[in-house]
């Protein structure tokens, strides 16, 4: 084949892949610059069905794609060049695999003759993501390989996929055609003649039926299950599962609804949101120990107390409802797992429990904690929990919330306020890393343009400083609230042997502030040390069309001392 034909065929294959991905539901493509991925990049540049997002750092790019996929509820494509560019996606791919988020990596690669021989920027890319992605290895584009074969390969890998896919794309040089003009996918091209019908339509070449199989109990099984004292525990649920339906289910059965930070129901007035704290409240815990049936929606519970409660209780019946076949119970309880969305399971023919309202006193205990937190957090000293509660109480219907790992998400789980409504809430709790949190929030903010708040710790923000470049490009509100306690002060809550070891090897104090970082990326910045100033800055930031930073500086021990004091009060109640 002439070299010019090589460049053209490379481009045609890139265009076929991206066109088919668009037909399979992809709305966004995230791209990092690089030469070996040129056929994909040039095809993406001409693809009108995809929104393009560019960033120079592949690690941040992967997490931005993760955020876009979470917010759009659709697969997102990622284009990278060869070499370590691909490896930099690994953390985001791990998180996506564990939380069933569909990312599609399109990695440019060297042809076989340039692998394992010292060629530049060439590593073994197939299988680079190990168990965390479905692997597809494409050959170098070849006129003898029918375009239909390429499309069916993409279709089989991507259709109905809820987890990452890695499509490795080998290309020989030349990569750059001499000119770009006209349609890449020309119906008059002899090579594309077999695809004339496909080119005229808007559907995938291969159309797969939905593969999810739902399972549900019989009416008789439901009747037996609800005959006793039970609780409903709600773990991580995505917004599209319509968790609000579980409120009605709880009220119909007459069992309390115990909600995790990631349930979309943590602040709902009809839920028992303070369950983490109630499990150290003596009277509440004694009451909860009477339960002999549990219905768990989702998994990846945040509270160790709730996890211990589920593990230690002697359950007569334990049901768990998951949207996919998965094993999400580190305590390995004997149980029956049903495959359904929360909304679908709540719509079954449920009966009133014979022990309905058995735990109504929990409402009183939950209210007691609500008043305790108002007095001791909202009206107490300025600190991390106070800021988190203020954010959770501010315009929840107007915005979406991304809560960072380590201390922020635990403070929200322990102390989030009861509210009329809850902002749509996102976390990265698959692998629970502190990497890529800002980039993920940028992806969430970029999809719809809805105001978004990120609550992030100082070490997490330092870890993802490059992603301020993504934030700079946003045209919708993203409020980056940095809780700066000068290090990893979650370790104040853990039994590290002594204070010197804690300081030298765990907390890693840095003495840094973020004003110059904000200035470097030309982002609005405020540093606050009291609640009134925070509220003013926060409301202003929610109305600003772009990203802005609010830095909250607190002492290293503020949050841990407050947690200890509140724990003591709860235990003595």
From Swiss-Prot:
Keyword tags: Magnesium, Manganese, Menaquinone biosynthesis, Metal-binding, Thiamine pyrophosphate, Transferase
Biological-process GO terms, alphabetical: menaquinone biosynthetic process
Gene3D superfamilies: 3.40.50.970, TPP-binding domain
Catalytic activity: isochorismate + 2-oxoglutarate + H(+) = 5-enolpyruvoyl-6-hydroxy-2-succinyl-cyclohex-3-ene-1-carboxylate + CO2
Note accompanying the cofactor annotation: Binds 1 thiamine pyrophosphate per subunit.
Coiled coil: none
Family: Belongs to the TPP enzyme family. MenD subfamily.
Assembly notes: Homodimer.
Stated name of the protein: 2-succinyl-5-enolpyruvyl-6-hydroxy-3-cyclohexene-1-carboxylate synthase
Native source organism of the sequence: Shewanella baltica (strain OS185)
């Amino acid at each position: 084949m002439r070299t010019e034909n090589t460049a053209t065929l490379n481009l045609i294959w890139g265009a076929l892949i991206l066109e088919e991905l668009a037909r399979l539901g992809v709305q966004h493509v995230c791209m990092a610059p690089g030469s070996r991925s040129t056929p994909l990049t040039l095809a993406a540049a001409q693809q009108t069905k995809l929104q393009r997002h560019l960033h120079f750092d592949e690690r941040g790019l992967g997490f931005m794609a993760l955020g876009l996929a979470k917010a759009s509820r659709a697969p997102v494509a990622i284009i990278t060049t060869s070499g370590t560019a691909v490896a930099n996606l690994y953390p985001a791919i791990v998180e996506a695999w564990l939380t069933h988020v569909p990312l599609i990596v399109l990695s440019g690669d060297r042809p076989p003759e340039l692998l394992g021989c010292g060629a530049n920027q060439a590593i073994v890319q197939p299988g680079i993501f190990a168990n965390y992605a479905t692997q597809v290895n494409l050959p170098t584009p070849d006129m003898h390989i029918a375009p239909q074969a390429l499309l069916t390969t993409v279709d089989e890998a991507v259709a109905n996929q809820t987890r990452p896919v890695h499509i490795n794309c080998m290309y020989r040089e030349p990569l750059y055609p001499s000119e770009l003009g006209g349609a890449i996918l020309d119906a008059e091209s002899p090579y594309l003649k077999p695809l004339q019908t496909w080119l005229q339509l808007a559907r995938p070449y291969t159309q797969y039926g939905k593969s999810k199989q739902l399972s549900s109990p019989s009416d008789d099984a439901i009747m037996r299950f609800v005959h006793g004292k039970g609780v409903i525990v709600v773990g991580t649920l995505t917004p599209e599962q319509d968790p609000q339906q579980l409120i009605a289910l709880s009220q119909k059965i007459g069992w309390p609804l115990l909600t995790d930070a990631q349930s979309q129901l943590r602040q709902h007035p009809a839920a028992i949101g303070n369950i983490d704290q109630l499990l150290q409240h003596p009277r509440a815990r004694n009451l909860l120990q009477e339960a002999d049936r549990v219905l768990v929606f989702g998994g990846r519970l945040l509270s160790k107390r709730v996890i211990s409660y589920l593990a230690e209780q002697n359950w007569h019946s334990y049901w768990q409802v998951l949207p996919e076949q998965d094993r999400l119970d580190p305590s390995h309880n004997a149980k029956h797992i049903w495959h359904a969305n929360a909304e679908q399971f709540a719509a079954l023919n449920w009966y009133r429990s014979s022990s309905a309202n058995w735990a109504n006193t929990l409402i009183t205990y939950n209210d007691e904690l609500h008043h305790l937190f108002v007095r001791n957090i909202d009206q107490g000293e300025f600190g991390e929990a106070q800021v988190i509660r203020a954010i959770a109480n501010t315009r929840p219907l107007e915005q979406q919330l991304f809560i960072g790992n380590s201390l922020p998400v635990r403070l929200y789980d322990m102390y989030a306020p009861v509210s009329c409504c809850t902002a749509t809430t996102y976390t990265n709790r698959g692998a629970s890393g502190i990497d890529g949190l800002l980039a993920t929030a940028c992806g969430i903010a970029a999809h719809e343009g809805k105001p978004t708040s990120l609550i992030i710790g100082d070490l997490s923000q330092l870890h993802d400083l490059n992603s301020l470049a993504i934030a700079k490009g946003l045209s919708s509100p993203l409020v980056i609230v940095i809780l700066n306690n000068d290090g990893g002060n979650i370790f104040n809550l853990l039994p590290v042997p002594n204070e010197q070891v804690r300081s030298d090897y765990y907390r890693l104090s840095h003495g840094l502030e973020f004003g110059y970082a904000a200035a470097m990326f030309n982002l609005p910045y405020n540093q606050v040390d009291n609640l009134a100033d925070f509220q003013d800055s926060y409301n202003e930031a929610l109305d600003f069309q772009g990203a802005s930073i609010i830095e909250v500086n607190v002492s290293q021990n503020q949050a841990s001392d407050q947690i200890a004091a509140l724990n003591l009060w709860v235990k003595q109640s």
